[in-house]
Amino acid sequence: THAIYIAKVLMEYVRMGSPYIQKHCLSDWYSDGKDSLGPTQQAVIQVVKGADANTTTGEGTFTFFSTPSAYVFKMLNSGFGDNIVKTEFSEVPTMANGAETLSALASKDAEGNLYIALVNADSDRDRNIALQIEGTDVAGNKMTIQKLETDSITAANTPEEPTAVQVTEDAEVELEGNPIINLKKHSFVIVRIAKAVEPEADKSELQA
């Protein structure tokens, strides 16, 4: 749960021009269901004390594991361009408390590759998002999608299952037109649409 809302917050940090590393990126002692910062493992790295560990001296055995929130940082670090691109939804569903379920942030890098970060905060419903890139024909471009999604909003990494929640990546596909992205309930994805590579002209029959 916490990872999805961290993703929403970090996207707003970027939109405002603020370094998202200012969002806390801390380690903390692991305890079931919560840590010192609050419920649902607020810190992105959890530290597990061994039986011989001394937290005062730092001596003894300690192990570490990443929370889903850490993967949000990793996805943004590896899937983001330097220039923000305007995004808008034709319609945004809301939850019972009035909060919007969908968020998007798009960017381009220096090579012209497009990155679209999408959040579906709805805990009950998947959403299909039809991407329309204004002024760009993406047919023939290559697309990859990184996903952070689970079957349950209470899913978490633990010392026993440190990789229960992790990032998956779909196989690269060649687009035939504007893609439709399936956003699972309570998920975060980053879509990368690579700039089409212009084929080199065949000069084999050119005469001097």
Name each model-derived stretch.
Residues 1-103, 110:
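Aromatic/acidic polysaccharide-binding cleft in carbohydrate-active enzymes
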Residues 199-208:
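Disulfide-bonded cysteine-rich modules in secreted/extracellular proteins
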Residues 109, 170-173, 205:
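Extracellular and organelle-lumenal recognition/adhesion modules and their flexible linkers in secreted
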Residues 28-33, 123-126, 152-155, 198-199:
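Flexible loop/turn segments at secondary-structure boundaries
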Residues 85-93, 127-131, 165, 169-175, ...:
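Generic detection of short hydrophobic beta-strand segments and adjacent strand-loop junctions
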Residues 191-199:
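Short beta-strand-to-coil "C-cap" segments at the C-terminal boundary of structured domains/repeats
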Residues 136-183:
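Acidic, Ser/Thr/Pro-rich beta/coil linker or hinge segments at domain junctions
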Residues 97-138, 145-150, 186-192:
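Carbohydrate-binding surface patches
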